[in-house]
Amino acid sequence: MTISKKMLIVFVLTIFVVSFGHCSDSFPGLGLKKQAHKQCYSPDLCTGGDSKCDICCVLISGVYYGKCIQSKCHCLNKTK
């Protein structure tokens, strides 16, 4: 099975669109390294401290806990 030039372009663009749709950080690249452990959400969750952020992250998955970092809610993996 051969990969056409058109399919290769679609595949590469898909990788970039998916990786830039996640929380951005200051490191260039695909962003896959840090995104497995962290997801950013609205800064409104951090108005009253970490509690709203933590509740939101725990509801998403029991393996996350919420932490407000630079006024943004981050869901961090408990195992990392």
Swiss-Prot record:
Coiled coil: none annotated. Disulfide bonds join 40-75, 46-68, 53-73. Keywords: Antimicrobial, Disulfide bond, Fungicide, Plant defense, Secreted, Signal. Its main location: secreted. The keyword Metal-binding does not apply. Residues 1-23 form the signal peptide. GO terms for biological process: defense response to fungus; killing of cells of another organism. It is found in: Secreted. Belongs to the DEFL family. This is Defensin-like protein 113. It comes from Arabidopsis thaliana. The lineage of its organism: Eukaryota, Viridiplantae, Streptophyta, Embryophyta, Tracheophyta.
